[in-house]
Amino acid sequence: MAKSKGARIVITLECSDKAGEFAQKRKPGVFRYTTTKNRRNTPSRIELNKFCPNCNQHCIFKEIK
């Protein structure tokens, strides 16, 4: 019998700073973090305040697929 995957899943967090589009950036493009979350404890999408090296400032990172 195969084991179930469990409640932990890998998610991707993407920088959602729209003001950073027009500001000076270090590099072009969008920065992403990967992390895990417990599906049972946090069923909704996560939003975290993390540092974005592209925008060179702290931004809100939103969960994507």
Swiss-Prot record:
GO-annotated molecular function: structural constituent of ribosome
Signal peptide limits: none
Domain of life where this protein originates: Eukaryota
Main localisation: plastid
Entries under InterPro entries matching the protein: Ribosomal_bL33, Ribosomal_bL33_CS, Ribosomal_bL33_sf, Ribosomal_zn-bd
Gene Ontology process terms (BP): translation
SUPFAM superfamilies cross-referenced by the UniProt entry: Zn-binding ribosomal proteins (SSF57829)
Cell compartments where the protein resides: Plastid, Chloroplast
Record-linked PROSITE patterns: RIBOSOMAL_L33
Keywords attached to this entry: Chloroplast, Plastid, Ribonucleoprotein, Ribosomal protein
Any one GO cellular component localisation term in the record: ribosome
Family, similarity comment: Belongs to the bacterial ribosomal protein bL33 family.
NCBIfam families the UniProt entry points to: PRK00504.1, PRK00595.1, rpmG_bact
Full protein name: Large ribosomal subunit protein bL33c
Species annotation: Pyropia yezoensis
Biological classification of the source: Eukaryota, Rhodophyta, Bangiophyceae, Bangiales, Bangiaceae
Gene (name only): rpl33
